[in-house]
Amino acid sequence: MYSYFLGLRTLTVTRDAKELIEKNYDIEIDFDNMSFDDPEVYEMFAEGNTLGIFQFESTGMRAILKEMKPDNFENIVAANALYRPGPMSQIPTYIQNKSNPNNIAYLHPKLEKILNVTYGCMVYQEQVMQIVRDIGGFSMGRSDLVRRAMSKKKMKVMEEERRYFIHGKKDKSGNLEIRGAVRNGVDEKTANQIYDLMIDFAKYAFNKSHSAAYAALAYRSAWLKKYYPVEFMAAQISSMMGSSDSVSKYIRECRRLNIEVLPPDINYSEGKFIVKEGKIRYGMAAVKNVGSAAIEEIVKIRKEKGKFESFIDFCEKVPTTVLNKRQIESLIKAGAFDSTGAKRAQLMAIYEKTIDGISKQRKNNVDGQVSLFDSNSISEKFIPRDNLPKLKEFNEKVKLNLEKEMLGIYLSGHPLSEFEEVIEEMSNTNSSELMELSHEHSVEMDRRLYDGAKINLGGIIIKKQNKVTRNNNLMAFATLEDLYGSVELIIFPNTLDKYGEIIQEDSIV
């Protein structure tokens, strides 16, 4: 079910990216007639440049792709099928055989035409069906029975079929129903070995048609990322607006690709992330507490009445029925009013008074159309038009913390930016990779992060809570944030006693 959900999200991403591309470049993309033979797309796979690519973006998978160096569609179909618990054990053989096809040894020559596409490795259920047909003489229907037995792990049924596979079967009238491997020129010992391989394969049997469908989605995504990276990444981030860790990960990928991500802006942003002049504009619907419905109304009003010239102009044009104080505060903290020329510190000082004044004025006007700042308006008692208080802007740390509060990420900078090189040099992993280890396959494949391995991770302590143990010792729970996301830490008494002075909130460790 998880893969199907991911597949649906990927379809949304490709659809949204396609719409952005067609709008920005006035071209039409025809996925239905797309060929799967672009060497530059496969070069992306071979380089492990697949962050954001369906089924191919985990750390472990990207490491495998760099070793496998896929150069055709069959390779990525196989990679998708092999990268899961069970068949992973065949990945080294697949990679070695792909590099040295002359060294592939088949148990019997009849297997070559069936397994050559996967370099001698048994990868798909369909290959098993073909083996029992070509070597055992099974019918199409009976080979499907074997496939179903495998997919449901019915080992008893599979063992019953073994003797038919080797020696064949006669019907009640004595007519030969299944020829069997021996009659087809395969000796009994070899036939048993082949069947043993199929039994072992049953532990992780995967349907090639499923893997091919996933690979096709992945290829489309990779094609978009290769030729239209800005639109692809904008659509990708929009699809993950509910996950700050994912948004942070993809924005970091944008920086790696030299794609500039601009902050949310009341005059330029829409609900989703959009592309303008080769840059991504942050979606206002991703600002906490605001909501998509309110953003839709803001965009609608902006189209009808023009750009918002100032904070006051915004408050006059957008009714409080659309946006309340909390929502406006969130937009201020996120920097969405920066383009009006007002400082965030100034707006934080006046926004409540401004909204109260406008609300009172609207109540005093029957039709609600008289401007708050008409010459006879009583609202001048509340705040003069655009006369902002003389306040210094928040310092960089405060601004970044406000961004983090409202966006879930640091956008215009990061408290760790000046330490990035040192952290990268001294760390052997990051929070994003550690989060992926919650999946079994990542644990198996990442050779650096095996169970019990020593982890070096740099970041900033953003939260710490002390706790007294049953033995009256002090331990702590903490949250460490790095440039990729955050992880939860447990600090046991001995460690806390030794390093307690530096394990404090806001400490860089």
Question: Language-model segments: which ranges?
Answer:
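Noncatalytic, beta-rich nucleic-acid-contacting surfaces in large DNA/RNA-processing enzymes
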Residues: M1-V509
